[in-house]
């Protein structure tokens, strides 16, 4: 692993991350029209106004769980990059098998 930045695998202390943007309230980036399109794809004709916040909440919890499992797989493999396979395995673990991304 020579010539790969901060000392290769496990060496060095790792520097402070510069310009790390503070992430907050990004769930609002899932816009009302985006939720509406997803509902249309699922066959929904008419949507209550209260659905949007509820959908954002449910989506946030779902993504937190999948990402947590994906990162666990990544850390176990001693990698720093989450791969598509990590996500596939995390989804499979939660009972939602996804085809088309390997394994």
Swiss-Prot record:
GO terms for cellular component: nucleosome; nucleus. The modification N6-glutaryllysine is found at residue 92. Its main location: nucleus. One of its GO terms (molecular function) is DNA binding. Keywords: Acetylation, Chromosome, DNA-binding, Methylation, Nucleosome core, Nucleus. SMART domains: H4. Glutarylation at Lys-92 (H4K91glu) destabilizes nucleosomes by promoting dissociation of the H2A-H2B dimers from nucleosomes. Residues 1-14 have a biased composition (Gly residues). Residues 1-20 are annotated as: Disordered. SUPFAM superfamilies: Histone-fold. The modification N6-methyllysine is found at residues 6, 9, 13. Residues 17-21 bind DNA. CDD domains: HFD_H4. The modification N6-acetyl-N6-methyllysine is found at residues 6, 13. InterPro entries: CENP-T/H4_C, Histone-fold, Histone_H4, Histone_H4_CS. It is found in: Nucleus; Chromosome. Belongs to the histone H4 family. This is Histone H4. The lineage of its organism: Eukaryota, Fungi, Dikarya, Basidiomycota, Agaricomycotina. The gene is H4.1.
